[in-house]
Amino acid sequence: MQVRDSVFVVTGGASGLGAGTVRLLVANGGKLVIADVNKAAGESLAAELGANARFAETNVADEASARAAIELAVSAFGGLHGLVNCAGIVAGEKTLGKEGPHALASFKRVIDVNLVGSFNMIRLAAEAMAKGEPNAGGERGVIVNTASVAAFDGQMGQAAYAASKGGIVGMTLPIARDLSRNGIRVMTIAPGIFETPMLLGMPPEVQEALGKMVPFPSRLGKPAEYAALVQHIVENPMLNGEVIRLDGAIRMQPK
């Protein structure tokens, strides 16, 4: 599938990895719906990018909100060919801490946004993609999810986050198999330490120390590098049902 003239929804598209992906896809001729809870940032980015970008204020875990983002893509641009799930939240809380056991409400919220929200967008996007005409290779769409290296080597205090991202890893292959009959591919990227709004808000010395943890290149990953992998996945039809670590060979320590 080519990016040019294809229609994409990017969740979490107003900042970080999502915004980097939106910028690259628009630059290569894609038509984008930026789906995010941050209205100000999303509207600003859409205005900056012009006619080939729209913003939808979106709570990915809410069916009506998620469906509205998908419907905007179809009504504004005539269909849907790609979904990139970047929306997510981070939480740090130990299973048993000084104040007692991990709050169940906070665990559920991380799962709801990161895992349930991703699946919610996948199922609704797949429905829209399946209605489209296939290309010459029989392909109707591609879905790219965002997991994390925490799915494989989660640190102390990351039980909820690692569980949510591990769920994304675990559902990648079965969903790819489910959607193969519809000509829809499903892939997952598991990023390491990247330049996100949260990390860029840390002191420079902390950012530098985190970057040095990466074997090579010894720095934080850049949103444009994540976006470049998304583009390659879109354009390479044999990539399906797999998880790619994008992490500079880092393996996280326990804490």
What are these model-predicted stretches?
Residues 2-33:
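Canonical Rossmann dinucleotide-binding motif of NAD(H)/NADP(H)-dependent dehydrogenases/reductases
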Residues 39-40, 58-69, 104:
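The beta1-alpha1 cofactor-binding region of Rossmann-like NAD(H)/NADP(H)-dependent oxidoreductases
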Residues 89-108, 127, 131-137, 157-160, ...:
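Conserved mid-core segment of classical short-chain dehydrogenase/reductases
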Residues 100-120, 144, 168:
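Catalytic Tyr-X3-Lys loop
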Residues 122, 164, 172:
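Active-site helix of classical SDR
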Residues 127, 176-178:
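Alpha-helical segment proximal to the catalytic Tyr-Lys
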Residues 148:
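Residue(s) in the substrate-gating loop at a strand-loop-helix junction
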Residues 222-246, 251:
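C-terminal substrate-recognition "lid" of short-chain dehydrogenase/reductases
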